[in-house]
UniProtKB/Swiss-Prot annotation:
GO cellular component assignments: ribonucleoprotein complex; ribosome
Source organism: Methanocaldococcus jannaschii (strain ATCC 43067 / DSM 2661 / JAL-1 / JCM 10045 / NBRC 100440)
Subunit structure: Component of the small ribosomal subunit (SSU).
Keywords from the UniProt entry: Ribonucleoprotein, Ribosomal protein
Record flagged with keyword Ribonucleoprotein: yes
Protein name: Small ribosomal subunit protein eS32
Gene expressing this chain: rpl41e
Miscellaneous comment in the UniProt entry for this protein: Initially thought to be part of the large ribosomal subunit. Crystal structures show eS32/eL41 to be a small ribosomal subunit forming a bridge at the interface of the 2 subunits.
Similarity comment: family membership: Belongs to the eukaryotic ribosomal protein eS32 family.
């Protein structure tokens, strides 16, 4: 089996990238909602 430490390190990097992308997406969605209201 692959050591957990190695895989967790990999996941941390992926998680950080996903988090940044997720935040960007959330911001975009909020802007679109405001535009739709007005």
């Amino acid at each position: 089996m692959i050591p957990i430490k190695r895989s967790s390190r990999r996941w941390k990097k992926k998680g950080r990238m996903r988090w940044k992308w997720y935040k960007k997406r959330l911001r975009r969605l909020k802007r679109e909602r405001k535009r739709a209201r007005s």
